């Protein structure tokens, strides 16, 4: 089948089987075109909870599918490609977290949503990149242990000087490697462009940005801005999607290394096989993890998503 024929068959099957397809913004344009909803990890899970579909296919990475299952326990949830994991989410395990918490008694533990469900069972609340500042501000705690990304944690801490922060030294392997030198090169090549950066980037990069925000925030800003050129400091799929959505504007990658191969694992054939029942992985979680991680995620929703 051609790409178009495969897309049409996927659209037919998802309707026939009453399945909702969710695609993270870092997926390919071809995958986004068959999705019912696109966005960031938390936004997709919220949409999954709202849909009337009996089943959900997550085109993203494992922690996203797990979050979706926790927020929609009555639905059947599949991860389209079972090999798609998030390196940052897998950097810290439970024994290491417990040891870290022992070093910081009296600290509230705040987990980035990019963590495993097992890890969330030991945390007080989780956050997204767009909600981290507001939730940490609202949290009834003066001391916060922020895991696993010190870049996002430092960005939050800089805006909340009244609170004391400690960090685990993990982070996104892609965003972490971008440097001030990359910014200098991109600015020199595109002097009229605005720089839009994800807070998973290092502080030396964030400090030079015209806008700092989540994937969804970056896309919304670029679409509304009067500027005509943008340097995109997050996963390079966003350059592709913004170029598709805003053909009258120009978008440039901040650095070629901002490509997440884990997010590129999911393909149209994966989704097709999932709908046929011959591929993908149905997500199941033990009852204690569903309950513990659910408490952590629900508190995030209560404090403002």
Kindly label every feature range from the protein language model.
Residues 1-232, 238-305:
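Active-site loop-to-helix "anion-binding N-cap" substructures in soluble metabolic enzymes
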């Amino acid at each position: 089948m051609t790409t178009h024929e495969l897309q049409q068959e996927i659209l037919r099957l998802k309707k026939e089987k009453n399945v909702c397809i969710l695609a993270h913004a870092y997926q390919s344009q071809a995958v986004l075109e068959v999705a019912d909803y696109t966005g960031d990890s938390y936004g997709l899970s919220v949409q999954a909870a709202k849909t009337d579909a009996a089943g959900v296919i997550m085109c993203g990475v494992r922690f996203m599918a797990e979050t979706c299952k926790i927020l929609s326990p009555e639905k059947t949830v599949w991860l389209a490609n079972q090999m798609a994991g998030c390196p940052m989410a897998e950097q810290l395990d439970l024994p290491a977290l417990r040891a870290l918490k022992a070093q910081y008694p009296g600290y509230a533990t705040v987990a980035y949503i990019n963590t495993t469900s097992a890890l969330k069972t030991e945390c007080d609340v989780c956050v997204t990149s767009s909600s981290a500042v507001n939730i940490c501000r609202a949290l009834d705690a003066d001391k916060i242990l922020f895991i696993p990304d010190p870049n996002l944690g430092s960005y939050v801490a800089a805006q909340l000087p009244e609170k004391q922060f400690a960090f685990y030294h993990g982070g996104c392997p892609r965003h972490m490697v971008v440097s001030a030198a990359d910014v200098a090169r991109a600015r020199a090549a595109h002097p009229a462009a605005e720089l839009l950066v994800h807070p998973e980037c290092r502080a030396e990069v964030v400090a030079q940005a015209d806008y700092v925000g989540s994937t969804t925030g970056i896309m919304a800003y670029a679409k509304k801005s009067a500027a005509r050129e943008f340097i995109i400091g997050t996963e390079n799929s966003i350059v592709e999607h913004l170029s598709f959505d805003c053909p009258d504007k120009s978008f440039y990658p901040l650095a070629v290394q901002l490509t997440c191969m884990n997010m590129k694992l999911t393909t149209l054939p994966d989704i097709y096989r999932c709908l046929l029942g011959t591929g993908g992985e149905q997500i199941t979680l033990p009852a204690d993890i569903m309950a513990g991680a659910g408490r952590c995620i629900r508190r995030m929703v209560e404090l403002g998503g």
